[in-house]
Amino acid sequence: MKYYLIAGEASGDLHASKLMNALKKEDPQAQFRFFGGDLMQAEGGALVKHYSEMAYMGFIPVLLNIDKVLHNIRLCKSDIEEFHPDVLILVDYPGFNLRMAKFAKTRLNIPVHYYISPKIWAWKEYRIKDIKRYVDKMYSILPFE
């Protein structure tokens, strides 16, 4: 299978790399393409964008880097479309990843799996509607999620 993964920060890179390792054991023909980091790259596949080039937290940093943020969104969408994976796997990072879920589901009809669900219990409860609409399978790492 062809897997496209998106992890936008260091902990996502760690969890996604472990997931990739497990997927390779179950699917020796696995092909990976991803936005991620060094740990994911060590598992193999094609690193499209390193998370260090896209991790902006808070309103002001996002605003100051809006051109880069929008470029990364466009790059990710076009790369997903070109690679056309069998599944899109999103790892946490909801501000970016929920946009990709909507795009993959509505424009490309690609199954969307979310590994490490967004913390809707902590903030932005409204995201639950988008998750229900655009995510096919959700995998939580905490028992109360």
Residues covered by each model-derived region:
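Active-site and donor-binding regions of nucleotide-sugar-utilizing enzymes
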Residues: 3-145
